[in-house]
Regions:
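Residue-level signal for inorganic ion chemistry
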Residues: 45, 49, 147, 192
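Glycine/aspartate-rich loop-and-adjacent alpha/beta segment that forms the canonical ThDP
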Residues: 192-217
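A short glycine/serine-rich beta->alpha loop
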Residues: 32-40, 86-88
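Short glycine/threonine-rich catalytic loop with a Thr-x-Gly-x-Asp
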Residues: 37-48, 73-75
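Active-site beta-alpha connecting loops in nucleotide-dependent enzymes
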Residues: 73, 91-171, 211-216
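Buried hydrophobic packing segments
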Residues: 46-56, 101
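Extended acidic/charged loop-beta regions that coordinate divalent cations
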Residues: 1-32
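Gly/charged, well-structured mid-domain segments that form the phosphate/adenylate-handling core
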Residues: 4, 16-21, 53-92
Length: 217
């Protein structure tokens, strides 16, 4: 025995409540919290913020107020209205985060469309093989009404989806045309996952068409 062991936890999630694509309820040390984003990974983030706040002497009530006042930042489950289509834009960049986002998306019980924009520039990572560790097989469900891919490496992500058993895929390599494609989606809600530079290109187009205030806002 070397004497090393896991330290005793000072703060822990004691209960998981309702989890949807747009909110999560949970308890930390018996204190109930709600955050305005979905995904188990965001509960981990909230636990980290809570732990630091309590270490600095911030009360649970103040932390809850901060959680409620928190705003979405670009690419982090922000919701953009595109002529009546509710587009949830999520940045993805590695398989662990991707699988967390897939699990988050699947908490939506309603029909939706699913898109993935993939580039392979240095800011994205020039090796796209990480997408093969994504659990795309989970998405082969009747309630996902439409699949589409885009970006410079759209063929890579389309191939991955087809290997997951998804045959009907709309492909749009030109990111300037993605917005028009979204308008024609068969569902009101569209989940759009994107690598970093593809997201910036899309946001530039969204800003030019006045759907958002600016490319980085």
């Amino acid at each position: 025995h070397c004497g090393f062991h896991r330290p005793e936890l000072k703060y822990r999630v004691t209960e998981l409540g309702q989890m949807t694509p747009t909110s999560s309820t949970f308890s930390i040390d018996g204190h109930q919290f709600k955050i305005g984003v979905g995904g188990l990974y965001n509960i981990y983030n909230a636990l980290a913020a809570y732990s630091l706040g309590r270490f600095l002497g911030v009360s649970p009530e103040q932390i809850q107020n901060a959680f409620q006042a928190d705003e979405h930042v670009f690419g982090r489950q922000e919701i953009i209205n595109v002529d009546g289509k509710e587009v949830t834009l999520v940045l993805v960049k590695n398989p662990v985060g991707l699988n967390q986002v897939i699990d988050m998306v699947l908490t939506d019980p309603e029909p939706f469309s699913f898109g993935f924009l993939l580039n392979a520039n240095y800011a994205d990572g020039i090796d796209t093989s990480w997408i093969w560790d994504g659990n795309f097989e989970k998405l082969n469900l009747p309630r996902i009404a439409h699949f589409f891919t885009g970006g410079e490496r759209y063929k890579d992500i389309s191939t991955r989806l087809r290997m997951a058993g998804i045959e009907q895929i709309q492909e749009e390599p030109d990111l300037t045309k993605v917005i028009d494609a979204i308008k024609k989606m068969p569902t009101k809600h569209v989940y759009l996952l994107s690598s970093y530079t593809a997201m910036l290109q899309l946001r530039k187009e969204l800003a030019e068409r006045k759907y958002i205030q600016g490319g980085m806002n």
